[in-house]
């Protein structure tokens, strides 16, 4: 009897990813905002270390933006330029308007790559990380952005 339930559980776990309808992204981009944690449960906040000093801060556990909203990626001498779709533009606008003085934490593949203090509202849907990223990461982000554009065009 236990063996049957165990096998049924394994079968269910094996089928869940197929039922989800998509594969996980090859690269993750998460943009979080610093929070005080007041009035929030421990499930709503996470601790993270931010460069350069390695200070520990609290961020909202659910990201404000992710690779799902990404539609353009370019790298030049000024850094990595990220362009977000309409939803991402609205979210970035709201986050930067409502959280002046807090840190915005940009995480790529689990690594904090940029953590500026929000001092201006970003209303054009473009975020620049002011340093170069490894070409392999840039290429993966560009692939995700292109896939998002194709998906939007089919809708």
Locate each region found by the language model:
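Hydrophobic h-region of N-terminal signal peptides that target proteins for export
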Residues: 10-18
